[in-house]
Amino acid sequence: MRIETENLILIPGTTNLLTSAIQGNDFLSKALGYVVCPDWTEFGVAPLAYTLEMLTQSEDKNGWWTYFPIHTVDQKLIGSCGYKGRPTPDGMVEIGYEVCPEYRQKGLGTEIANGLLTHAFNDELVKLVIAHTLPMENPSTKILRKLSFKKVCEIVDPEDGVIWRWELKKP
């Protein structure tokens, strides 16, 4: 299911789109039907391959992984975003997002995060949305604060080291 915001359409990553993204920007552009920012992701193909593996195991997880944010005026893929899987049994889901450099500082990161948040809270199972950031003030921490997330703790992630955990409970 697409998520639509004022300036964006967030297109869920299907197995076809994820396979195309892994093959390269030209393949992704053709599969999406939109121009692709050359530096739309800073994370490489590993997260896309992981998502593809999860969707291959069970298509019912679709809508709870990667989304491709399209800028509606420019008709261009400007980053990536999504969830780290379906809500847990106790109703928690994690969001993540990135915006390519040429589209930063325009409110689009906030718009992406808010779209993910609204979509998550529209699901009756979701009670809590979390996010993680580097342990310093940065654009992502500003976005989360703007959306009423609270920094709840500092944790040590096996891959990223020390990170901050943010939470927002369903209103």
Residue ranges and their predicted role:
Residues 131-141:
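Conserved beta-strand-loop-alpha-helix junction that forms the acyl-donor binding cleft
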Residues 144:
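Conserved active-site tyrosine of GNAT-family acetyltransferases
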Residues 1-94, 99-102, 115-119, 123, ...:
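GNAT-family acyltransferases
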Residues 107-110:
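Glycine-rich acyl-CoA binding loop
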